[in-house]
């Protein structure tokens, strides 16, 4: 017996049914999910604010990390907390006390610039999310992206997809380094000829 927590906004996952007394608990933006969020507001690089609904209960939470994807993470956490019997106050406190680990959406602020450090074990989804967040920053927005590893036979296509996404984002400069990132840089430039794209084959360059 138990539960499995799934993203109810995923067309494939939403089809999962109870199996061997394992009950699916869905989270997402649809009010048909057991745990859902709405009234989502971006606070720029400071984070996100949203209302989380747990059954007949709703509460507002300030997520201290930016990006719409962090709302999904908060909803998943709320679903797990609810399963384990935490109160809404405890769930809210846990989400609002979140601290990023090194390499995972960590903000490094200096007197001249702000670095969004999301370099640990990057993947296409995390890179696209980082680019989306970068758009909310003030001043010049510079993305420095490297090769993504362990992507298998689709590695070239996946780097191109990130490049296309970068080309559509409101950023000022894209710097790509690494052999696979050549595909990313070329696709970004084709997608947005006005974007300043710099490519270096290795970090030493």
Name what the model sees in each region.
Residues 1-115, 139, 164-167, 171-173, ...:
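Acidic, Mg2+-coordinating active-site environments of NTP-dependent enzymes
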Residues 10, 120-122, 150:
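Short, glycine/acidic-enriched loop or turn micro-motifs at the edges of active sites
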Residues 101-103, 120-129:
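Glycine-rich phosphate/pyrophosphate-binding beta-alpha loops
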Residues 128-131, 155-166:
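Charged helix-capping and loop-helix junction motifs
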Residues 133-142:
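Glycine-rich phosphate/diphosphate-binding loops that line cofactor/substrate pockets in enzymes
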Residues 196-205:
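Short acidic-hydrophobic, aromatic-tinged amphipathic segments that line or gate anion-handling sites
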């Amino acid at each position: 017996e138990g539960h499995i927590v799934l993203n109810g906004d995923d067309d494939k996952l939403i089809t999962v049914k109870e199996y061997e007394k394992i009950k699916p608990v869905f989270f997402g933006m649809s009010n048909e999910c057991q745990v859902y969020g709405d009234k989502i507001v971006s606070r720029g690089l400071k984070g996100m604010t949203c209302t989380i609904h747990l059954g007949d209960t709703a509460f507002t939470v300030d997520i201290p990390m930016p990006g719409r994807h962090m709302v999904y993470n908060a909803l998943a956490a709320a679903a797990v907390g609810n399963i384990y019997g935490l109160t809404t106050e405890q769930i809210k406190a846990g989400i609002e006390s979140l601290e990023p680990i090194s390499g995972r959406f960590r903000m490094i602020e200096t007197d001249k610039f702000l670095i969004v450090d999301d370099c640990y074990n990057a993947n296409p989804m995390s890179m696209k999310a980082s680019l989306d967040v970068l758009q909310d920053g003030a001043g010049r927005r510079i993305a420095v992206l490297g090769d993504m590893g362990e992507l298998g036979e689709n590695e070239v296509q996946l780097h191109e997809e990130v490049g296309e996404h970068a080309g559509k984002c409101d950023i000022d400069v894209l710097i790509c380094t690494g052999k696979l990132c050549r595909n990313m840089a070329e696709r970004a430039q084709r997608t947005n000829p006005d974007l300043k794209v710099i490519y270096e084959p290795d970090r030493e360059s």
